[in-house]
């Protein structure tokens, strides 16, 4: 969580600068991102890509829907990166995590290799914040989508 500010005075500012915590807002707790994909190769690739691209994330992995939903129920998750093409159905996970698309429990980014516009439209209609194709997405693209999704959900929660 970013430092919210306050009156530190000159000594506090000096210490903050010495520790690399000044100006306020520079120090943040990493967001917890859960990557869900039944393909072990894709799961490792995207999890490692996020870890290597940015220290902003604590990345968790799940290879199936049941374990993913248990993880989401047992600890705070800031964003989910979800493959829809899984034996248990990625849409099932999406609907569990976003029962009301106007106020999602957690932002969900769909990351799939299936290039079907109707699939993306259906995912967004059911609450996905963004839909990305694996074959044309970089770690930077995914990072940007995660940041935008978390900001959008935070704004929606604040407005309600």
Predicted regions and their residues:
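Conserved phosphotransfer microenvironments
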Residues: 65, 81-97
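Two-component/phosphorelay signaling modules centered on CheY-like receiver
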Residues: 40-60
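C-terminal output helix
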Residues: 118, 135-146
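Active-site residues of response regulator receiver
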Residues: 37, 82-83, 112
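As written
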Residues: 77, 90, 122-130
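Short amphipathic alpha-helix used as the core "switch/output" element in two-component signaling
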Residues: 70, 91-104
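The C-terminal output helix
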Residues: 146-160
